[in-house]
Amino acid sequence: MAAKEVRFHDNARERIVNGVNVLADAVKVTLGPKGRNVLLARSFGAPHITKDGVSVAKEIELKDPFENMGAQMVKEVASKTADVAGDGTTTATVLAQAIVQEGMKYVASGMNPMDLKRGIDKAVHAVIKELQTLSKPVTNSKETAQVAALSANSDEAIGKIIADAMDKVGKEGVITVEDGKSLDNELAVVEGMQFDRGYLSPYFITDPEKQTAVLEDPLVLLYDKKISNIRDLLPVLEQVAKAGKPLLIVAEDVEGEALATLVVNSMRGILKVAAVKAPGFGDRRKAMLEDIAILTGGTVIAEETGLTLEKAGLAELGSAKRVEIGKENTTIIDGAGDKAKIDARVQAIRAQIDAATSDYDREKLQERVAKLSGGVAVIRIGAATEVEMKEKKDRVDDALHATRAAVEEGIVAGGGVALLRARAHIKELKGDNPDQDAGIQIVLRALEAPLRAIAANAGDEPSVIVNKVLEGKGNHGYNAASGQFGDLVEMGVIDPTKVTRTALQNAASIASLILTTDATVAEAGQDSKAKAPAELDY
């Protein structure tokens, strides 16, 4: 086991604070509408330019192990805020730094760190309560666009495209971000249910120009096993041919003789048919087949339910208004399923989302809800270069998360003003002893930090701006983008309540842990004057 170096008291805390400051100062420059970019080197490829606080924080590793501990703890603030709220990472980092810096003064003067922590917790709890009082719900598309634009570094085009996407797929809909092929951002909305499986044979194509197979008013056969023997399929094929309707087959796979027969029948015009593989794998495949069954009003033919392919009839088949099958995707539009059953299925999946422990599972379940209820919107990012596209994508992701947070918990005035207004309401707050009172004072001062950083990045004097904002009331604040004072909500400078709340909670949590640290242990540094390798004789 490697030797360890142990540091105590001020010696330990000082190095931690140095690490906190290095990381926070690098992240802080990105805050506000006039915040700057940070250039991140890559071991291969072009450097990455970003204005996203958590992306900057994740890149930072310090050489000194004690300083690195401080940096990693603040990195945790940014990461946790990004995970929960999706935005506000820079605000959280700035607040954490402010609480640590203020708190260290009191710790150095001999106050009890545990009581300081209790005071900090009391103040944060009171501020969050006040933020919830100040919060108002998002009522229209304009406010949605304003939240998104502000989070995307005041980019109104991004704000508008996100608001449009939300209007089209609803609050529960899935919005994905992809690389575009042009210079402009594009929004594509997939209505109906789309899954990532295409036709099993190009001979099913009905539109050679678009390379798609289109079935109008088809019946839908759902089977959870492979189909390789045409004899199993014949009874149902004959019934479909008599009904004079096209047929979509969704199965684990269709191969060999069965696929060849379907292709021949399709090409001769005897039966308009197309076959695709079922989406997903394992249990997820079964669940998605069941989703398609409910959406189309059909039944999954599976041995568990006592149904076999040979005995299947028209009663087991679902139907839809239209099915479009491409090389890689299948879209079922306007399925004939019972609305009450679809709603019940959506509620059941939502219950699974609440119980899910993994982010991946939660994301996949949310996709299923969207496919059943609203549809999927795809935002394609346009840019001239790959570096610009990555930077834009970062901002769109931030804006998307901020917008969802705003829809969830409402909005407050942005620009650090909500925290200052909440501060005014807790000035009279008292702790159980003078040390707890000092903890409350730490938070009161730290709440100014985001506005100070925004003003400093805009080239203004922070103290002057803070005092002018404090002279006003309600949503009156400083719009750093225009350099004007006024009602920030009317100006469209708004933050999601969830983002502001999460930023403060996480910042206070980590900062108070740093204040209560009295010893640090890290691997002892290696001798910097290590012997140079001996020169070789030639």
Curated annotation (Swiss-Prot):
Gene3D superfamilies: GroEL, GroEL-like equatorial domain, TCP-1-like chaperonin intermediate domain. GO terms for biological process: protein refolding. GO terms for molecular function: ATP binding; ATP-dependent protein folding chaperone; isomerase activity; unfolded protein binding. It comes from the Bacteria. It catalyses: ATP + H2O + a folded polypeptide = ADP + phosphate + an unfolded polypeptide. Pfam families: Cpn60_TCP1. Keywords: ATP-binding, Chaperone, Cytoplasm, Isomerase, Nucleotide-binding. ATP binds at residues 30-33, 51, 87-91, 415, 479-481, 495. GO terms for cellular component: cytoplasm. PROSITE patterns: CHAPERONINS_CPN60. Signal peptide: none annotated. Its EC number is 5.6.1.7. It is found in: Cytoplasm. InterPro entries: Chaperonin_Cpn60_CS, Cpn60/GroEL, Cpn60/GroEL/TCP-1, GroEL-like_apical_dom_sf, GROEL-like_equatorial_sf, TCP-1-like_intermed_sf. Belongs to the chaperonin (HSP60) family. Together with its co-chaperonin GroES, plays an essential role in assisting protein folding. The GroEL-GroES system forms a nano-cage that allows encapsulation of the non-native substrate proteins and provides a physical environment optimized to promote and accelerate protein folding. Forms a cylinder of 14 subunits composed of two heptameric rings stacked back-to-back. Interacts with the co-chaperonin GroES. PANTHER family: 60 KDA HEAT SHOCK PROTEIN, MITOCHONDRIAL (PTHR45633). HAMAP family: CH60. This is Chaperonin GroEL 1. It comes from Chromobacterium violaceum (strain ATCC 12472 / DSM 30191 / JCM 1249 / CCUG 213 / NBRC 12614 / NCIMB 9131 / NCTC 9757 / MK).
